[in-house]
Curated annotation (Swiss-Prot):
Belongs to the glutamate 5-kinase family. GO terms for molecular function: ATP binding; glutamate 5-kinase activity; RNA binding. This is Glutamate 5-kinase. ATP binds at K19, S179, D180, S221, G222, G223, M224, R225, T226, K227. It catalyses: L-glutamate + ATP = L-glutamyl 5-phosphate + ADP. NCBIfam families: proB. Substrate binds at S60, D147, N159. One of its GO terms (biological process) is L-proline biosynthetic process. Catalyzes the transfer of a phosphate group to glutamate to form L-glutamate 5-phosphate. Pfam families: AA_kinase (PF00696), PUA (PF01472). Its EC number is 2.7.2.11. It is found in: Cytoplasm. The gene is proB.
Amino acid sequence: MTAPASAPRLAQARRIVIKIGSALLVDSANASLRLEWLQSVCADIADLRSRGAEVIVVSSGAISLARHRLGLTSRRLRLDEKQAMASVGQIGLAQGWSAALAGHDLVAAQLLLTPDDTENRERHLNARATLQTLLDLGCVPVINENDAIATGEIRFGDNDRLGARVAQMTGADCLVLLSDIDGLYTADPRQDPSARHIPVVEQMTDEIMAMGGEPPPGYSSGGMRTKLLAARIATRAGANMVIAAGQEHHPLRRLQNGGLCTWFMAQTDAGSARKRWIGGSLQPKGTLTIDAGARRALEESASLLPAGVTGLEGSFGRGDLVLIRDADGSIIGRGLIAYDSEESQKLIGHRSGEMEQLLGYRGRDALIHRDDLALDLP
């Protein structure tokens, strides 16, 4: 568990998801945002953006902001009360992020997600496409769990795992968990003075997972255990993950400058992880037959456009898996389709510019985006 020569660096990442917990963002004394701290984080984000990185924020804090304002601080909240607190606090949280990012000429965009948005294929495609468009427009998406509607049975439960799912969904190459601790230790350093800091974790073994404990008291619903669960998700999806202390101003700058932290090494790259999932974990619902020109385009890593599709079989919904067959009848790949079978039938053989006339609305140009393709070409 010693640092390898090629230990990752934040400056090397091109798409970064940053998770920030309630205890860092909300001042427990007066239940308000730590505005100077938040402004320093946004300055760090602006610096990362200036270096060419795309940044997505996963931010807790809505419930913590609201429960003090509404006088519900002395007892554990019921689920319906948490949902009400989220509705109240989310407004102030979004306003705080918007103002702080605007100070660096950055535009904030708010998204509230539930597990279904990352696990249901159709909603997954919608959420990912929205995030990609926001990044293309130069925005900084600020994401939180949609606590106002999520139930106990269908919720992430903590934003560490939400951050990992967002990293997985967007193909991020780095997930940063800013915390009240500077990484993983062999034991809880607050209770065991002999605990040793672990700078790099190369494999998520049972021994590593056993180092997680119960969540500490206070605002945060997460603890080291949830961070290790997030690390397992993120590293399997091809993202490096880092746990770093975030209490002081400019925590990302300090991380870039070599501050104490723990890196969890990606077990693959994001593209390969996604293509393995598409290629081997789902059952196909239909088949598209393509012409020679479309095959050549796929060989050059292009998306599958409707003009190159000559035939369609099966009944499928948006986000379902379909097989791709070339003109010789060979199955050359599979992918997640952006339209259902009825709409796809209307589109095949037509140019993307005709989509609006054919469907009555302007949809996505590709039947299958290149990121949703897993090819098996000879």
